[in-house]
Amino acid sequence: MAEKKAVTSHEPVVGLELELEEFSGTYTNPGYGAFTFCSPSGSSSYCQDVISDFTAVDSVQSSAPHSLQLLAAWPRIWASHIRAVHQSGNKFLVQWTSLFPEGYGRDITPFETAEIGTSDATAEFVVEDGKVVGFGLVGLVGQLTERERTHATVKDRVDVWFDKA
């Protein structure tokens, strides 16, 4: 498995439209299922477990992101967690990652990995009437799609749409 790279951005950072906590919550998609994003201030037992896992891994990595983040557990065959790092506006860089907060085997050093060939995607959140209604993912195919090029609304141009529950 490949080690995750440091998250960097070359675009000027523009703040979020709402507080980060407003972007936390459960999101659903009929094909991908549901997951819950936690902000660093998430207080539920689920969020405390997720934050603890990421904190353990990030504490031993020099390349850990220092930007605003949303974090989620997402146990699948190719990943155990999702890390969404704020880029600009309502856009986040989404990384599917596998966390080993207690190490593996005899080595108890926490670490994070990602499958070779998986690409990061961009999540663009949509806010209507002061509330987050969902987000769309683009970049899953690794190149600009016809939908991205020709459609105006986020929901129409993304590869996958998640509704906020």
Kindly give the residue locations of the regions a language model identified.
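Peripheral terminal and inter-domain segments
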Residues: 1-165
